[in-house]
């Protein structure tokens, strides 16, 4: 179109001029049609000036230059005596850009692409560019299977040579795959091969990855999957000859035909390593584990190359090249692998930098580094630094980049780029809890206090059954070696009867301190001391409670519901943590084991020990870690020492949002059995002096397990994927009392055997976790499908400040 205008303009110029072959001298230049563009700007675009002698070639160059400026959609050059007359039609200015009908592509993404093409508000409208954008967008829709899609640019003229630009989308529906055919396969059936594809012509209900909607990119991925399937099974000559994609007349169906040549199976004849091995030949050769006689395997070859690169990377060779050339012998069906290694230069680290840590101090991040500045680069040490930063839980994302230093042959900078998340919360207000009723809460919790890495918490709770306050602080680097120091003080006024537990009131306060000793990258040992004072009152005569009092030599009365006593205990606290999770919040891979215990020491009124073990394992089932299987367990056991029992207020409980969802908090397990008698108003019907109830008392042993399937959250933008998590789960748990005596009198009163651990409760449901500005929120809906008499269901539950 532009060349056509050039030709017309040149013809007009030639027909309107009378001069010799040598041209003429320009005495003046006049413009017609300028509106937005200044005369000076137009003159600067022209190669011709007043006083120049011009000919046909000069005029042609002038026309080209004016078109190239991007300001004009039509240019004509005429001669009027010694004056050059330039007639132009300016391109209109874009006043606004809007979109309509786009669902698959967001407005922000469209604006970015338009701006990259020079289409933005205030700029001139280039209709050729606009046409290219229309075609490009339609091509995009075709690539994702929407063949009926159309994109039209609607240009509405406005005064002063301005226009409104509106892109109107008609996306249509995605074409679905009707059938996938593979032609030429003999060793494997078509069904077996297609079962590895993402694109499917039939998707079973249980397949959460398969998709019938055609996408060109997914097809390319499936072709690579097909190629790898054959190469991993010895078919070294396998080839995909062609691929045909056919569209049904209504553009709603797709037929895919893949033509392949399988070839024969080949075995390894040997592996030969050559090149610049940087003195690590023995280690490199140990990585070439493919033995003569085994089937050729493409994945093993790739893994071997990656292992060699990682090995060299640990020694500072940041950019090694490893290429494997297969020498195929068709006569004896063997493949000899020639591995050529070029280690390249050895690099050392000039600087380690951090970007994005607006709150966290550099020192907090730098102390997690295992790679040192000025030392040889170690890729494994760099990766450990990334892993440790992720496990801190301060960041949504952590990326690392090794950048070569300009002008230096052997220096690199290591740059860690982090995106900080909200690590604290301030909360003051009134809420409603599923277990606590109306709740008044105030608290400040900051896991990265002022960017120092300190964890500081001030919390208080007031509800129907509890008044609680606590101050805690932890310094994760009390020493430069990573020994941590933490401590807390607390006060708790707990009315168990109002919490649907057995009847007693406990006012307690205490203090404890703990040192943590890192053993290696993943293991930490903890040791500490604690003190707690318990003041119990309003104790109704209950069998398990009175059994404990008897073990202390307390003469509690079974005819009174106003018994009480106090105890002061000093404890030795210990623990061990193994943490190999990929990050500190919302992990997607790895495992964590946490062992905690305490035992009373001389000077205590009680003598007991208590141990808990928590485990969690995350197993991703896709490369992007969006689909994850989570297995969790919690075990607990405690007992008395020296003939005494563990205090009943130290019992384990289960049920609620953090253990077995779908059951009321702390409701699973043994229930209170009260003594009945004159003056006691604790039961309606007593048998043999005992009265059973639905009040939970907990037990000295507990086992809880959970299987969870974490999925992408439906209808949620990728932008929020790191702050919201959805999962389907199944929970199971049991609490029991190993010291319970299932006597004949108990059986006659209809009391279950609370020493039996097989009374397992089970539930299943769905959960949503959200890292909100107020802190982590957890919502769950669960349906119990195995419960016992006295259990209380609670399908919908929520919790603040708990993640797993």
UniProtKB/Swiss-Prot annotation:
Cited InterPro entries: Bac_surfAg_D15, BamA/TamA_POTRA, D15-like, OM_assembly_BamA, POTRA
Biological-process GO terms, alphabetical: Gram-negative-bacterium-type cell outer membrane assembly; protein insertion into membrane
Residues in the signal sequence: 1-20
Pfam families in alphabetical order: Omp85, POTRA
Gene3D superfamilies named in the record: membrane protein fhac, membrane protein fhac: a member of the omp85/tpsb transporter family
Keyword field: Cell outer membrane, Membrane, Repeat, Signal, Transmembrane, Transmembrane beta strand
Primary location: membrane
One GO cellular component term: Bam protein complex
Subcellular location: Cell outer membrane
PANTHER family according to UniProt: OUTER MEMBRANE PROTEIN ASSEMBLY FACTOR BAMA (PTHR12815:SF23), SORTING AND ASSEMBLY MACHINERY SAMM50 PROTEIN FAMILY MEMBER (PTHR12815)
Quaternary structure (record): Part of the Bam complex, which is composed of the outer membrane protein BamA, and four lipoproteins BamB, BamC, BamD and BamE.
Function: Part of the outer membrane protein assembly complex, which is involved in assembly and insertion of beta-barrel proteins into the outer membrane. Constitutes, with BamD, the core component of the assembly machinery.
Stated family: Belongs to the BamA family.
Name by which UniProt lists this protein: Outer membrane protein assembly factor BamA
Species lineage: Bacteria, Pseudomonadati, Pseudomonadota, Gammaproteobacteria, Enterobacterales
